[in-house]
């Protein structure tokens, strides 16, 4: 239900949140290797997250990406991440392609989609990086977010 870009963005920010105590920057190519994702694609999808102020980037020898100053894993929801990649306002568009689909001018799927999309958006808004990190701590065998073992 989310794009590959959003999936990778969530995994990357989960990784950065787990590393936050080290207070260092991580190169996109190093994260990509650890996360098992294409490096050029990861570098591209991190940029909207920088623009939104969720992460900070720094060029140069000790550069890379990290959570933005003052941002904690509890501050960043999946909605924040996915919206940066996909502009979630588009989810409200009619499933059947009607130019106007509202309670007054509903398509056959309007009520179902309205309820489903509301639940989906609420789930994204109520789930934080901290919760994903907690899952990783409780279930390290899951391999999330890094399918590649740390050497």
Predicted regions and their residues:
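Minor-groove-contacting beta-hairpin "wing" of winged helix-turn-helix DNA-binding domains
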Residues: 61-69
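Alpha-helical residues within the helix-turn-helix
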Residues: 33, 50-51
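A short alpha-helical element within helix-turn-helix/winged-helix DNA-binding domains
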Residues: 26-36
């Amino acid at each position: 239900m989310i794009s590959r870009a959003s999936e990778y963005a969530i995994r990357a920010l989960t990784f950065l949140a787990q590393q936050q105590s080290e207070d260092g920057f991580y190169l996109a190519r190093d994260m990509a290797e650890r996360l098992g994702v294409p490096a050029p694609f990861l570098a591209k999808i991190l940029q909207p997250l920088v623009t939104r102020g969720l992460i900070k980037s720094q060029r140069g020898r000790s550069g890379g990406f990290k959570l933005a100053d003052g941002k904690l894993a509890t501050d960043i929801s999946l909605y924040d991440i996915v919206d940066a990649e996909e502009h979630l306002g588009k989810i409200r568009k009619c499933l059947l392609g009607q130019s106007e689909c509202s309670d007054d001018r509903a398509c056959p799927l309007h009520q179902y989609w309205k309820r489903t999309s509301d639940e989906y958006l609420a789930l994204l808004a109520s789930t934080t990086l901290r919760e994903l990190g907690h899952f990783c701590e409780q279930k390290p065998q899951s391999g999330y977010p890094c399918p590649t073992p740390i050497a």
